């Protein structure tokens, strides 16, 4: 999978020192720029699912090997990772609580954070880890995320705004990798992304045959997984189309572009094909394991056990038509495909993949996500990790049973 061989670049969610980058930056393409028609073809044929191979509970807990400069054990030790406050989150873009912290060895860590004392902060800290771990374990592509305990020196009382007195503060945080490159674009926006309707339509326009049937099955399984996780924040910039193989630079013209990092793109010639294997990934799965909704509310759409438990997997319909129960955000609109239709082939395929994930692996997912921070506290005020994990696992397994019990109409 992409996540097992990820190359990091020096911009975005995870930034590293220029010394680290200097050896590789000049040879990494940021993007392939092509025509809308060629991009639609890349999208139709893109890898949606790959067999993740055999994973143990320990593998699931630790996450993709080599994706980060720290192991799970290092990042989640009692001491955690020490860094110095570098920049307020409001200066980094976006509205969710975050900040930039610099380590002694020069790593700039862009962190979404949660204050375990006040139990406030960014709930995407938990949702991103849980969702990306689950997708990876099932064979679907998502940008990896590392749970991390941080000791921030010189941290203001509010690290997102930069306001308040400064002292050493401890947070439960999440470090996310940059998305894979080169992305495949048909315009000048590196975050062009793709919508669920785009991918749905591209597959529908494939010639009848084995490839279209396979792509439809994988797409419907991924769609159903999104319903399962209540991933409603499905605007197009949350997804990427990228080249998952060696790029043929002879198929176009290399050009410098200072808007992107690394500053190098390939302008694909008409009729040429620079990428032999395209793939799709989801780059933001933070608003998951809640109740979704038009606003992607911090309180209910992101890692909220009660809201997630209340959501059934399927809507009530007549006959065998299956529609997932999912309200997408306003920004996704029609392109996000609310209450999506699920085929029997897609349902069955997802069930098969879910059966490969053992209960201990599910426990590892929620342990990695630090759901204990959201659960009940013991008499001494400390989180009751085992009890919290048990509750999340029980709801997870109930949703699996809902999918197992349903029968849907076959794809066209």
Which residues make up each language-model segment?
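Sec-exported extracytoplasmic/periplasmic mature domains
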Residues: 136-140, 227-230, 401
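Conserved ATP-binding subdomain of kinase catalytic cores across diverse folds
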Residues: 75-191
């Amino acid at each position: 999978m992409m996540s097992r061989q990820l190359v990091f670049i020096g911009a975005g969610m995870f930034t590293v020192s220029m010394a680290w980058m200097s050896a590789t930056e000049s040879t990494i393409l940021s993007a392939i720029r092509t025509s809308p028609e060629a991009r639609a073809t890349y999208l139709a044929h893109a890898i949606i699912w790959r067999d993740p191979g055999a994973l143990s509970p320990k593998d699931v807990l630790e996450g993709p090997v080599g994706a980060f400069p720290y192991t799970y054990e290092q990042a989640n030790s009692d001491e955690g990772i020490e860094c110095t406050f570098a920049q307020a989150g409001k200066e980094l873009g976006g509205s969710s609580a975050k900040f930039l912290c610099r380590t002694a060895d020069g790593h700039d860590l862009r962190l979404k954070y949660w204050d375990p004392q006040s139990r406030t902060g960014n709930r995407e800290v938990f949702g991103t880890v849980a969702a990306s771990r689950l997708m990876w374990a099932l064979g679907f592509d998502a940008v990896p995320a590392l749970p991390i305990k941080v000791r921030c020196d010189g941290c203001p009382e509010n690290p997102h705004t930069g306001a308040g007195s400064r002292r050493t503060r401890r947070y439960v945080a999440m470090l996310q990798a940059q998305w894979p490159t080169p992305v495949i674009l048909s315009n000048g926006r590196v975050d062009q992304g793709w919508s669920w309707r785009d991918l749905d339509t591209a597959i529908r326009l494939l010639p009848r045959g084995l490839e279209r049937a396979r792509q439809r099955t994988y797409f419907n399984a991924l769609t159903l997984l999104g319903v399962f996780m209540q991933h409603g924040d499905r605007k197009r910039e949350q997804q990427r189309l990228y080249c998952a193989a060696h790029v043929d630079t002879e198929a176009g013209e290399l050009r410098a572009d200072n808007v992107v990092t690394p500053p190098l793109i390939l302008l694909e010639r008409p009729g040429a094909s620079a990428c032999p294997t395209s793939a799709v990934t989801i780059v933001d799965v933070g608003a998951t394991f809640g109740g979704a909704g038009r606003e992607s509310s911090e309180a209910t759409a992101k890692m909220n056990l009660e809201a997630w438990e209340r959501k059934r997997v399927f809507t009530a319909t007549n006959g065998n038509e299956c529609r997932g129960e999912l309200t997408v955000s306003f920004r996704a609109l029609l392109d996000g495909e609310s209450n999506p239709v699920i085929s029997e082939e897609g349902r069955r395929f997802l069930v098969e993949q879910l059966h490969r994930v053992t209960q201990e692996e599910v426990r590892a997912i929620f342990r990695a996500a630090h759901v204990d921070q959201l659960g009940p506290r013991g008499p001494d005020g400390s989180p009751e990790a085992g009890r919290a994990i048990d509750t999340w696992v029980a709801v997870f397994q109930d949703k699996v049973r809902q999918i197992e019990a349903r029968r849907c109409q076959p794809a066209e």
